[in-house]
């Protein structure tokens, strides 16, 4: 089906270009933060440090969960998967941005652009599904504590993880397939620091209304479904906690769920505003800042958010550190 769509869209593009006798652009310029040329070196160093800390933090968390048998439970399986996705998301965007800070040419080929876009949509969507899965896991742990081992079996956890990654891949394939109908013949300037769908649609000389509709339908559906799952899960958790009227239980629930709620807020806030304001042609700078937050800053913060207030993770880290000294 995907190959058929690609064939149809490529054929349509070639026919349109033959009719218009236009020149097809196959390279683009990522403007990024070019409007601040005096800050190139400081920005390069800042983002390099952020990227290194992000990779070390997320990979370190994965290794910690993998090595400690006490962390081989669903909650940490999902957390390790989130750390992997965060490291992948940051690696999709940051290296190219760092190269562009130092390179004279800011060019990116169409094929490179499509690969980056595909990787970005896959990781961003997968993270949405993972955050929803983690909310469901917390719901079962708090509201159905006695049945938790029965419900959250290894088989179910693996299925939820696989579905999250498949959902991310399918979402990316849909937008990638529809992007083959686009042609670029007027401008090759992408007002962004990576290849994203909205900036590409803005410079396309093909009618991109179908693509905008696909973004609205599919990206909107993913956000509504995952945010809805998270809100329902935590609403039930809240009522369950209030019914128990136990200070100790409330503290434990807040400690367990607080990190996840903070991560969800930081991630979905800019992501939602980005697509709500994407139709505005004046929103380029704001769009870049929102994108920077959920592609670079959130992957940096997540390991800290989930680790600093988690006694099990801290104890595991201390134990592993002492054993290696």
Swiss-Prot record:
Report the protein name in the record. Olfactory receptor 5H6
Q: Which InterPro entries match?
A: GPCR_Rhodpsn, GPCR_Rhodpsn_7TM, Olfact_rcpt
RNA-binding among the record's keywords?
no
Question: Predominant location of this chain?
Answer: membrane
Q: Which residues lie on this side of the membrane: Extracellular?
A: 1-41, 92-115, 177-212, 275-287
User: Molecular function (GO) terms listed?
Assistant: G protein-coupled receptor activity; odorant binding; olfactory receptor activity
Q: Name one GO cellular component term.
A: plasma membrane
Looking up SUPFAM superfamilies in the UniProt record yields: Family A G protein-coupled receptor-like
* Family (UniProt): Belongs to the G-protein coupled receptor 1 family.
List the glycosylation sites. Answer: 21
Query: Entry's Gene3D superfamilies?
Result: Rhodopsin 7-helix transmembrane proteins
């Amino acid at each position: 089906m995907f190959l058929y769509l690609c064939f149809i869209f490529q054929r349509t593009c070639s026919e349109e270009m033959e009719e218009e006798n236009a020149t097809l652009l196959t390279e683009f310029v990522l403007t990024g933060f070019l409007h601040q040329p005096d800050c190139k070196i400081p920005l390069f160093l800042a983002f390099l440090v952020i990227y290194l800390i992000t990779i070390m933090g997320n990979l370190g968390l994965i290794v910690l969960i993998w090595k400690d048998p006490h962390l081989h439970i669903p909650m940490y399986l999902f957390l390790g998967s989130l750390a992997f996705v965060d490291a992948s998301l940051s690696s999709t965007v940051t290296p190219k941005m760092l190269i562009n800070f130092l390179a004279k040419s800011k060019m990116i080929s169409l094929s490179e652009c499509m690969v980056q876009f595909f990787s970005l949509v896959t990781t961003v969507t997968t993270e949405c599904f993972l955050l929803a899965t983690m909310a469901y896991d917390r719901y079962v742990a708090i509201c159905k504590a006695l049945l938790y081992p029965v419900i959250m079996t290894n088989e179910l956890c693996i299925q939820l993880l696989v579905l999250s990654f498949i959902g991310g891949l399918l979402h990316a394939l849909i937008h990638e397939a529809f992007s083959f109908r686009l042609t670029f013949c007027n401008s090759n300037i992408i007002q962004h620091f990576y290849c994203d769908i909205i900036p590409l649609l803005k410079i396309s000389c093909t009618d991109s209304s179908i693509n905008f509709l696909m973004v609205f339908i599919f990206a909107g559906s993913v956000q509504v479904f995952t945010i809805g799952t998270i809100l329902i899960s935590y609403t039930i958790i809240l009522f369950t906690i209030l019914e128990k009227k136990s200070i100790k239980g409330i503290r434990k629930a807040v400690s367990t769920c607080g990190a996840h709620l903070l991560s969800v807020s930081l991630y979905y806030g800019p992501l939602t505003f980005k697509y709500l304001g994407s139709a505005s042609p004046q929103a380029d700078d704001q769009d870049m800042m929102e994108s920077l937050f959920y592609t670079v800053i959130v992957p940096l913060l997540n390991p800290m958010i989930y680790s600093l207030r988690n006694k099990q993770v801290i104890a595991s880290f201390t134990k592993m550190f002492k054993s290696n000294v």
